[in-house]
Amino acid sequence: MQTHEIRQRFTDHFVKSGHTEVPSASLILDDPNLLFVNAGMVPFKPYFLGQETPPFGTATSIQKCVRTLDIDEVGITTRHNTFFQMAGNFSFGQYFKEGAIKNAWTLLTNSVDDGGLGLNPDRLWVTVYEDDDEAAQLWHDLVGLPTERIQRLGMEDNYWHMGVPGPCGPCSEIYYDRGPAYGEDGGPAVDDSRFIEIWNLVFMEFERGETKPDGSFDIVGNLPKKNIDTGMGVERLAFLLQGVDNVYETDLLRPVIDTAEKLTGTRYGTQDKDDIRFRVIADHSRTALMLILDGVTPGNEGRGYILRRLIRRIIRSARLLGAQGAVIEQLLGTVREAMTPSYPEIEENWERIRSVGVTEEKAFLKTLESGSQLFEQFLTEARNSGTSVVPGAVAFSLHDTHGFPIDLTREMAEEASLTVDEAGFHELMAEQKARAKADSAAKKHVHADLSVYRAFIDSHPTHFTGYENTADEGKVLGLIVDGQLADRASAGQHAQVILDQTPFYAESGGQMADRGSLRGPGGLAKVVDVQKIAKKVWAHLIEVTEGELAIGELLEARVDQKWRHQARQAHSGTHLIHAALREVLGPTAVQAGSMNKPGYLRFDFSYGDQLTEKQLQQIEEIANSAVDTDYQVNTIETSLEEAKAMGAMALFGENYGKQVRVVEIGGPFSMELCGGIHVDHSSQIGPISVLGESSVGSGVRRIEAYTGMDSFRHLAADRSLVANLAANFKATSEEIPERIDALTAKLKAAEKQVQQLRAQQLAAQVGSIVDSAADVSGVKVLTQNLGEGLGAKELRSVAQDAIARFNSETAVVLFTSQDGEKVPFVAAANPQAVERGLKAGDLVKAFGAEVGGRGGGKPALAQGSGSDASGVDAGLAAVQRLVNEILS
């Protein structure tokens, strides 16, 4: 039975029994504590916690999930997958244990002709919580399961809770017996290789208290309603129903392994270490595609780092299996074919998915080549010196300079029977992060614990009136000073104010929050920011400038209209830029993020290549043409399904409610799901000036622009610059490019002439320089600062010339210079010196350590660059010391 059919039978079974079918949520939820959705119940969590009222009594879903905690175990065993699908049925006070058990048993054991999955009931076992007599009795009486196939296990195995005070309850797990070929008899309590868990039924009926020092907790009460949460692993059931040994042999993953065989020329099933790599490729390819589908792009932090790590593990595994060229497009293409029947949205987003994957592969292949050279160089040194540990500094250099994740360095080290000084690596990483933190202002945010807002979230959500008004009255429901609830806030204090209603827009959707003022009967405050808490409460960050504000007062909330107007211009301008981008670049240019503040916009989008100047001009012209056309801007409140049917664009990875807001500019020109504040007509945006574009990550570009008066001022500054250039060149504005080209050509010719003269001068001096070499234990040692203005190329030429002049004498040289802010340096050693242990690479490292740089190369010739010219003398002395130590 194909996986898609298993999914369909599951859904049909529960829909027929009255459950509401709920589509899978995105893998990315608006939860800072959750990297990815990792369980089927996660999207229903607010209902189970009582934070929201479910719009249905029972539901069923097949949820996309990603778990990356055991990413290093993938492939080593056949059990671990980073991406999986969790089929579940949920009841919110409608049915309990009897309904859950009956539903599961019926679907699993009914014949295929009757809509079931056709499992042999004689092969099914269950476990229940050791004290759950009711569940054990139901399994026996309701479905006829023999008592010997009902096993009781303890709290660790069969009791569900979230690790914190809240709902909890016993659970019951269903297992399938694969037969004696897979292990000994005795049920799941004895052998979890033979007995495979396929379904977990959680009976939520109690509320637990705080965790005690010994790890236990008390049951403090019953839940108002008894709930059901179940989860069935689709992939596990698929390999059982398809008659194969594990998930990697199913219709979802085996085709990816087949493609990998063709790409690498290696056969699966011949060597264990190769099989591990094949499974890594299959698992990670599927997960990477599903993450990109939901809007994740490769990066160096968080979700982006996970995706980057997966793609890089795919590429390296493929190369270790023998792949020579690119592999990502073909691997993702195979995943596309396997997954599209269940996720048709893959097809419409394929070009974007392909582009992100291929772009990351190109970048990593360059990284892999340069980083591998450095690692191989260290391996040679390690073998010579007998060390078994990769120093933290080497791992940090691979990460910082070549983009090697620490796990990749660890894998490469393990393959060479080495370990990595990860403590040293993390210490250097921490130092780097501390420096970065000191150099940048901390992002402002609401600095109170979320519990402070709990009462307002549950009972007093803020009513936003800002779509219609820029001024309104609001009652003070809460004041927070220094992270604690307070009765009042006085002049000079910074605080947060929660009102029952407000015209202030809270930062969201890329749009900065409004600024303005709050005035009460006894005080005045400046609003410096507004943050949305749990999507329900507006926290106004204020500075009290006069008197005081107090709980219960009625305040006049007034938005700074100039700020609001310019923010609206920027946000509407972003929509025009987005539409223009898609017109010029095609539908693969999909939004990856944005930021709008008064007069300025920044728009990130998925695209693999740098934009040309011509493309930027086209985008700017299309956007300004839309401004000139004076399109009407309409907002429409509608259902998510209707919005999609209208053609409204949604942000990938964003989770929308059933009701959404559509912003339409000029009918078909631009239509997006958006909760921001916009102009009424496109002409109100004013001129849009595109500043340029840049890369912000693998496969992600950023375009920046000014709007309104900021755009006008930018254009005026450009005009003034052109006028000054024209005056200096005594030319018209049209002639300036030609004059600059001519001047540049003259400058390059002069620089070339200077370099030639300098090279001739140095060549004439090499003889006298060589004569100044010192003799150390029969070795000619020459270290010298050759002054300013020499680059690596010139230093290399002098070093090679000098070393040649020593003829049969053993000799090493190191030369340095100051080239602007850089300190280039080159070392050379002739064969006789290398034989005595004097290697150019070692000299370069010793010198580089003193000038804030690093370098590398071969034993005969190496070079590097530093940034601290004050350390040149110390560097030359360090080289002398190293030579003395080696020769002593």
Swiss-Prot record:
Question: Pfam families recorded for this chain?
Answer: DHHA1 (PF02272), tRNA-synt_2c (PF01411), tRNA_SAD (PF07973)
SMART domains linked = tRNA_SAD
How the cofactor is bound: the record states: Binds 1 zinc ion per subunit.
Tell me, which GO biological process terms does this entry list? alanyl-tRNA aminoacylation
Keywords noted in UniProt: Aminoacyl-tRNA synthetase, ATP-binding, Cytoplasm, Ligase, Metal-binding, Nucleotide-binding, Protein biosynthesis, RNA-binding, tRNA-binding, Zinc
Positions in coiled-coil regions: none
Instruction: State the needed cofactors, names only.
Output: Zn(2+)
> Per UniProt, where does Zn(2+) bind?
571, 575, 674, 678
Protein family per UniProt = Belongs to the class-II aminoacyl-tRNA synthetase family.
How does the record comment on the protein's domains? Consists of three domains; the N-terminal catalytic domain, the editing domain and the C-terminal C-Ala domain. The editing domain removes incorrectly charged amino acids, while the C-Ala domain, along with tRNA(Ala), serves as a bridge to cooperatively bring together the editing and aminoacylation centers thus stimulating deacylation of misacylated tRNAs.
Its biological function? Catalyzes the attachment of alanine to tRNA(Ala) in a two-step reaction: alanine is first activated by ATP to form Ala-AMP and then transferred to the acceptor end of tRNA(Ala). Also edits incorrectly charged Ser-tRNA(Ala) and Gly-tRNA(Ala) via its editing domain.
The protein's name in its UniProt record = Alanine--tRNA ligase
- Which species is the source of this protein? Corynebacterium urealyticum (strain ATCC 43042 / DSM 7109)
- Lineage, opening ranks: Bacteria, Bacillati, Actinomycetota, Actinomycetes, Mycobacteriales
Report which gene this protein is encoded by: alaS
